């Protein structure tokens, strides 16, 4: 990273100290978990600047350590109060300081009173090398075809041509909308294909192909050909384990991997460690990408432009602004249901709308006829802090500009004098992805000496022996387990509840989730209640859509009777309502 970018990031982290101190001092102890995770991430981020000669580095780093210590002491006090113990912060971190910074005080605390027997159980259940969890795959000599390169270069298209020739194949997607798109494409081209995502299942009679979100992969099933899309997600702290599981566990002799070039070295390391074979093909743009060096003016908008911002609020603000000028826009952002995204895409493709206003959700998914990508901002909130975009993010978004046969040159512009930064990010070499994220598998339930929460915490602190793997962030698992602790459920049920996809950080969704836990395990109901929506504004409708998905996922995972047709019909009604609101902006 260039020195200017380093200094900007450092200054941003430094300036956040007073606000963070104020917040944690006035936060109830049981709500400190998210702050603890966020502060540890900032400490790790600061550590990267250690040798950059920054003034005040030592002082800022020590202040963050003091904040973490304050939070950790309160968490230990709360643990002692709940469990009748008398652990001290200093005792816990005395010989475990690196683990404390890496996984948090409570995770380290739990390892202090784990007997050696339990450690041996972990060794027996979890092999030293994650690849050895997948015995079926290790008996095969698999061949990987690496389709790696820039955005919008036909990587997935070429792999799909091969998939169509298979007797039995799977397309593994990062997004429901991509799984849906390829499910429809295969069926329209005469290849019978079923659809499986966390939100729906459409089983086509006689189909031997499946298009699914990657978390739905059955690694015990045999396939002829598989496509793993957007492989760079293997480095994602929350979801990356699903890509690693597919890479290591697929029971398939021909596997096509599509994604960014900066994953190449890691993939080769893992493939060679599995004693499998590979071929590599790099993809480069056939359509040139041209940077505009004049700062973009909002009045200079043109047909086919896509304006990129990093919050739903900014998407709506810009859409209202251009709507007031008589310029209709399609809108794309993370909370938008896939059905609505699709309608918005179609309106843009069919020129019913002139421009696109979008978040970085556009970086993955459908290729659109975009003439020019315009960065209206160069910072985003990543879940823990507001930071500058990295080079891979800029390239992924900028690469959406240009469409063969429609726009034979793709243009990139930016707002607010940020052209140099965008140009630098486009031309700089991406940071190499060095680690694949791994998650705990269900075999953890075989360990009987500890509750599931403590086992997961211990798992997260155990050092990986292979240098190209790291543990996933289990903080969401811990939050859910803390919320359901009072129900006294068996571990198998707890594990199943952890696999239900919903926004754990959203209090309304957590309340809906706990209501279903109540209905099933306290009231012992055979069915759970359908969600309702009384206020039909944009935010409430989007939340209602998420509740419908939760109703579906909860019912499906526990094999409950539920009104599946109502789910599909109600989703369509909600999507229509949302789309009407967006059309009137």
Regions found by a protein language model. Give the residues of each.
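Conserved interdomain hinge at the start of the Helicase C-terminal
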Residues: 157-163, 238, 242, 249, ...
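Walker A/P-loop
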Residues: 139-158
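Conserved segment of the helicase C-terminal RecA-like domain
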Residues: 253-263, 351, 368-430
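Conserved strand-helix element at the start of the C-terminal RecA-like helicase core
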Residues: 167-182, 256-258, 264, 299-325, ...
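Inter-Walker segment of RecA-like/P-loop motor cores
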Residues: 177-182, 186-222
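Post-DEXD/H (motif II) to motif III coupling segment of the RecA-like Helicase ATP-binding lobe
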Residues: 169, 225, 232-288
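Non-catalytic terminal extensions of ATP-dependent helicases
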Residues: 1-124, 136, 441-585
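Conserved two-lobed SF2 helicase motor
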Residues: 149, 205-225, 348-367
């Amino acid at each position: 990273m260039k020195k200017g970018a380093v200094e900007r990031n450092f200054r941003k982290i430094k300036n956040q100290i007073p606000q963070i101190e104020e917040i944690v001092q006035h936060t109830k102890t049981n709500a400190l978990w998210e702050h603890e995770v966020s502060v540890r991430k900032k400490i790790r981020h600061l550590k990267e600047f250690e040798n950059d000669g920054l003034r005040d580095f030592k002082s800022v780093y020590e202040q963050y350590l003091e904040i973490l210590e304050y939070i950790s002491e309160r968490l230990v006090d709360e643990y002692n109060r709940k469990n009748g113990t008398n652990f001290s912060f200093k005792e816990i971190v005395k010989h475990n300081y690196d683990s404390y910074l890496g996984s948090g005080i409570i995770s380290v605390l739990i390892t202090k009173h784990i007997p050696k027997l339990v450690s041996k159980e972990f060794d027996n259940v979890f092999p030293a090398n994650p690849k050895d969890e997948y015995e079926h795959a290790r008996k095969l000599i698999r061949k990987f075809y690496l389709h790696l390169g820039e955005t919008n270069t036909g990587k997935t298209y070429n792999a799909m041509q091969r998939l169509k020739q298979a007797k039995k194949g799977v397309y593994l997607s990062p997004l429901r909308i991509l799984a849906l798109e390829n499910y429809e494409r295969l069926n329209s081209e005469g290849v019978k294909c079923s659809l499986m995502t966390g939100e729906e299942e459409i089983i086509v009679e006689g189909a031997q192909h499946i298009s699914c979100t990657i978390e739905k992969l059955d690694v015990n099933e045999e396939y002829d050909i598989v496509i793993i899309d957007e492989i760079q997600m293997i480095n994602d702290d929350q979801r990356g384990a699903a890509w690693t599981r597919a890479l290591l566990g697929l029971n398939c002799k021909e596997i096509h991997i599509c994604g960014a070039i900066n994953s190449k070295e890691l993939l080769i390391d893992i493939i060679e460690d599995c004693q499998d074979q590979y071929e590599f093909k790099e993809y480069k743009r056939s359509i040139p990408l041209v940077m505009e060096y004049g700062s973009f003016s909002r009045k200079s908008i043109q047909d086919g432009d896509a304006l990129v911002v990093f919050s739903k609020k900014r998407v709506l603000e810009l859409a209202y602004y251009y709507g007031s000028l008589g310029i209709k826009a399609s809108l794309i952002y993370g909370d938008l249901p896939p059905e609505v995204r699709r309608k918005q895409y179609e309106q843009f493709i069919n020129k019913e709308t002139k421009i696109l206003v979008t978040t970085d959700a556009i970086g993955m998914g459908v290729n659109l006829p975009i003439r020019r990508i315009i960065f209206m901002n160069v910072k985003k909130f990543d879940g823990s802090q507001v930071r500058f975009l990295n080079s891979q993010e800029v390239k992924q978004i900028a690469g959406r500009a240009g469409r063969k046969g429609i726009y034979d040159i793709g243009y990139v512009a930016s707002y607010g004098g940020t052209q140099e930064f965008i140009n630098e990010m486009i031309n700089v070499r991406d940071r190499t992805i060095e680690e694949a994220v791994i998650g705990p598998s269900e075999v953890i339930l075989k360990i009987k000496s500890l509750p599931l929460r403590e086992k997961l915490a211990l798992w997260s602190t155990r050092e990986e022996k292979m240098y190209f793997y790291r543990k996933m962030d289990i903080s969401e698992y811990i939050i859910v387990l803390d919320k359901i602790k009072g129900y006294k459920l068996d571990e198998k049920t707890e594990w199943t509840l952890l696999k239900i996809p919903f926004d754990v950080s959203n209090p309304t969704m957590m309340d809906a989730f706990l209501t279903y836990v109540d209905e099933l395990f306290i009231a012992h109901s055979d069915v759970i209640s359908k969600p309702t929506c009384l206020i039909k504004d944009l935010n409430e409708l989007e939340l209602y859509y998420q509740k419908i998905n939760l109703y579906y996922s909860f019912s499906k995972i526990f094999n409950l009777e539920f009104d599946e047709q109502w789910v599909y019909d109600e989703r369509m009604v909600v999507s229509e309502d949302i789309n009407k609101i967006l059309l009137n902006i």
